[in-house]
Amino acid sequence: MIMVNLRIINFIGDIMKIRGICYRCGAEDELIDGLCPICYAQEHPLIEVPDRVEIEVCHMCGSYKRKIWQTPKSEEAFEILNEIAYYATKDAIKKKSVMVEVEIYPEVTQLPGGKRSKLIIPVHIVARGRLPGEKEDRTYEKDIEVHLRMVQCPRCSRFMSNYYEATLQVRAMNRYLTEEEREELDNFVREELAKRLKKDRMAFIAKFIPQKEGLDYQLGSVGAARNVAQRIKEKYGGKITETATLVGVDRDSGKELYRVTVSVRVPEYKVGDVVEYKDKYYLVTAITEDKVYMKSIDYKREKIGLAWHIAEKETKMAKKKDELDTATVIATTPTIMVMDDKSYEVYEFDNIGDVKIKEGDKVKIFKKEGVSYLVNKIEGKDKQ
């Protein structure tokens, strides 16, 4: 398609070329629209661009407005200004032919001073190529000025006015978050929002509200709240719920405006904990985004998987992993016998195929209402 277009351009150019006297300088040469090549080049630059270009730049975050507000690719001040001047110039240039290539050279020498400051960036432009009817490429150079108009972008304006579209609630099922979980989850939320900001300029925290139950974040973007909640669920497991509250009507469109609350509840328990489900006790063996996987600690060693909406309602914590008693194996045949490491009581269990142990191994045991259960063998980093 491009080759066809170039042939058409060259054909039109050949028609335009007639040898004669240039009406501008009087030289005899091949004429293009009545002008010799030199005069034609002077009358017809390769590009059109104004001497002064203006662009809006946010004095708070450094974003700049093209068709929409753009976040700079760099974090270094001079590189940001180079980027702004480059795109301001590029958007203002109108090429006169597809055979023209343009190079843009911003010349940043100073930094802006603040909200009401003015900054002018000189820019040198080099265009190379030719117009229809010209035999050879030529070069056209021009110096312009890019004027930065310091304003406050919509995002920062909303941020400064505590604007928010959604509340992200981080909770735990059937209990409060521990201090350790609060710190870990808060760091995770902030890291995920920092990543999200590169795609969603409204993914800022308008307000952080610690609650006794967990953590609340008022966010500038509903999408950010949903995205971070999903990332928490992917990493820790759990359940997400969403509600919306009518807060008003848009003046321009008449559409109803809602604030959304996205609640993510991480599991009550972790891998290695013992939980109760339908009057039986289970060892938590795996936690995924959608389910919790467990194994009964009786002689059957039944394996099951529960969706989180079921697990939240029908299971409860029986004993945390770190709170289980430990014991030492003193015999393995015909039954397994262990001695409690604290009370020195001896307990006897049936030999269970999926628990491969030998004398001297450390195991965890669970005691409830006079009944003892062999939970699992202590291995790896769990060894004391």
Curated annotation (Swiss-Prot):
Which cellular components does GO assign to this protein? Answer: cytoplasm
Recorded superkingdom: Archaea
Q: Which InterPro entries match?
A: Nmd3, Nmd3_N
GO molecular function terms listed in the Swiss-Prot or TrEMBL record: ribosomal large subunit binding
Protein name in the entry: Uncharacterized protein MJ1650
- Organism listed in the record: Methanocaldococcus jannaschii (strain ATCC 43067 / DSM 2661 / JAL-1 / JCM 10045 / NBRC 100440) (Methanococcus jannaschii)
Per the UniProt record, the lineage of the source organism begins with:
Archaea, Methanobacteriati, Methanobacteriota, Methanomada group, Methanococci
